[in-house]
Amino acid sequence: RVCYAIPLPICY
């Protein structure tokens, strides 16, 4: 599981 917060918070 990978989560990013740029530009919006999204988790794959």
Curated annotation (Swiss-Prot):
- Its Gene Ontology biological processes? defense response to bacterium; defense response to fungus; killing of cells of another organism
Keywords, alphabetical = Amidation, Amphibian defense peptide, Antibiotic, Antimicrobial, Disulfide bond, Fungicide, Secreted
| Residues modified as Tyrosine amide | 12
Where does it live in the cell?
Secreted
**What's any one GO cellular component for it?**
extracellular region
Q: List the disulfide bonds.
A: 3-11
Keyword Secreted recorded: yes
Q: Which domain of life is it from?
A: Eukaryota
Q: What is its main location?
A: secreted
**Where, by tissue, is this protein expressed?**
Expressed by the skin glands.
Its biological purpose: Antibacterial activity against B.subtilis, E.coli, S.aureus, M.luteus and P.putida. Antifungal activity against S.cerevisiae.
Q: What is this protein called?
A: Tigerinin-3
Q: Which organism is it from?
A: Hoplobatrachus tigerinus (Indian bull frog)
Top-down, what is the taxonomic lineage of the species of origin? Eukaryota, Metazoa, Chordata, Craniata, Vertebrata
